[in-house]
């Protein structure tokens, strides 16, 4: 085991503080409407220019192991805030820096670190409760667009396209962000249920110009096993041919003679048919087949419930208004399932989302919920260059998270004003002893730091602005974009309450941990002798090439 370097007390905390400040100073430059740009060097290609705090934080690694620990802990603040609300990472970093700097000064002056932390925790809980009281529901498209605009660094077009997407697919709908091919942002909405499986054979295509298979008013046969024997399918095919309607088969797979026979029947026009693999794998595939069954009013043909293909009748088949199959996707439009059953299924999936602890499972359940309850919207980000595209896409994703958070827990006045107003909750708050009171006072100063930083980035005087905002009340604040004072909500400067709350909680949590740090352990740097060049015999004239 490699030898370790151990530092204690003040010398450890000083090193950690250097790392905290290096990372936070780089990140906080991006805060607010007049946030500065940060240029990130890349090992290949052009450097990236960004105003996204997380992208800056991810790039920073320090040479000194102890300083690096401080930087990594602040990174943790940003990622905690990001995990909770999807945004507010820069605000969280600014708050954490203020808490750590003030806290370590107090510890150096002889205060008890544990009591300081208790004071900070007490004050944080009171401010969080006050933020809940201050929040207003975010119901209409205008408010959603404003939240998106603020989160996307004051880009109106991004706020508006997100509001439009939310309006079209509902609050439960899935909105994905992709790189577009044009200069402008585009929004496309998929009606009905879409899953990422395409037709099993190009011979099913009946619209050669667009290479899709379209079935009007089809019946849907849902099977949870492979179909390779055509004899199993014959009874259903005959019944469908008599009914004179097209058929879509969704099964684990259709192969061999079964697929060949379907293709021949389709080409001869005996039965209009198409086959597609069921989406997902394992248990998720079964669940998604059941979703399609509920949506179309059909039943999954499964031996687990005593149904086989030979005994399947038209009653077991689902119905839809239209089905479109492309090479990659299948879309079922206007399924004929009963509303009550769809609602029951939605309720069941919601309960599973509440219970699951896995982020991956939650995301997949959310997708299933959207396909049943809402729809799917795709925002295609347009830009002039690759560098701009990456930067813009990151901003759209941030804005999307922020608007979701706003719909969930409401909005508060932006620009750091909500935290200043929430100070009312801790003006008279007292701890159990003097050291706890110092912790409370320390948080009182720290919550002003986002407002001060936004002002500083805009080139104005932080103390003057902070003082004037504190003298005001309600939504009164400072619009750094225009340099005007006024009602923040009316000026359209809103923050999701969840983002502000998560930022403060993450900052207080990591800040408290750093203040109570007493020792740090890191690997000692190894002294390696400079390695000579290996012999490259037989390659005359190319010595020393790496």
Swiss-Prot record:
Gene3D superfamilies: GroEL, GroEL-like equatorial domain, TCP-1-like chaperonin intermediate domain. One of its GO terms (molecular function) is unfolded protein binding. Coiled coil: none annotated. InterPro entries: Chaperonin_Cpn60_CS (IPR018370), Cpn60/GroEL (IPR001844), Cpn60/GroEL/TCP-1 (IPR002423), GroEL-like_apical_dom_sf (IPR027409), GROEL-like_equatorial_sf (IPR027413), TCP-1-like_intermed_sf (IPR027410). It catalyses: ATP + H2O + a folded polypeptide = ADP + phosphate + an unfolded polypeptide. Its main location: cytoplasm. GO terms for cellular component: cytoplasm. Keywords: ATP-binding, Chaperone, Cytoplasm, Isomerase, Nucleotide-binding. Its EC number is 5.6.1.7. ATP binds at residues 30-33, 51, 87-91, 415, 479-481, 495. The keyword Nucleotidyltransferase does not apply. One of its GO terms (biological process) is protein refolding. PANTHER family: 60 KDA HEAT SHOCK PROTEIN, MITOCHONDRIAL (PTHR45633). Forms a cylinder of 14 subunits composed of two heptameric rings stacked back-to-back. Interacts with the co-chaperonin GroES. This is Chaperonin GroEL. The lineage of its organism: Bacteria, Pseudomonadati, Pseudomonadota, Gammaproteobacteria, Pseudomonadales.
